[in-house]
Amino acid sequence: MWSRFMINVKVSAAVYPTEDPEKVTKAISVLFTGIELQKEPLDAAESEKRVSPAFRLTGEGGLDLLFTLHGLIRREAIIDSIRNKVFSKGLSSEGLLVRFLLNKQAAFVGIPSVPAEEEPLGSIEVVIRTDSPEEMEKLFEWLLPLTEEGVPVVEVEMDYVERG
């Protein structure tokens, strides 16, 4: 029996003056069903960019926020692609946090896509925190499992995770 643990998921995206805030909201909501987004002011680093965003949309929750993303990654058969990009760039050295970006335009039509780098009008940023490296490993086994020819070798459940 697994001990229960918490997963914290934070999703945010800068909204630029040329963007429709409703479309950015939809792009996030398509991948993260049930997320409640708040409008937040910019931090100092963002407001110093050449083209400055107007504000940032941010939402937080638990594992439940990842269920839609979990299904879409499988529907699009991109587990390997996403896992390779996330592991190679986004996992913290202590293994408690993973950070990755998702393309806003692809998200708008329900396709999770990790851009090669930060996009000119920003990306959707996803930050996932766990209490231990073992918990992060279990999360990866569930969200981005090892595959054979693109099909998960084993699908694990996450029923031992506290619901935020």
Curated annotation (Swiss-Prot):
Q: InterPro entries, alphabetically?
A: PAB1135-like (IPR002739), Ribosomal_uL5_dom_sf (IPR022803)
Q: Which Pfam families match?
A: RNA_binding
Tell me which family the UniProt entry assigns to this protein: Belongs to the UPF0201 family.
In its UniProt entry, what is this protein called? UPF0201 protein MA_4659
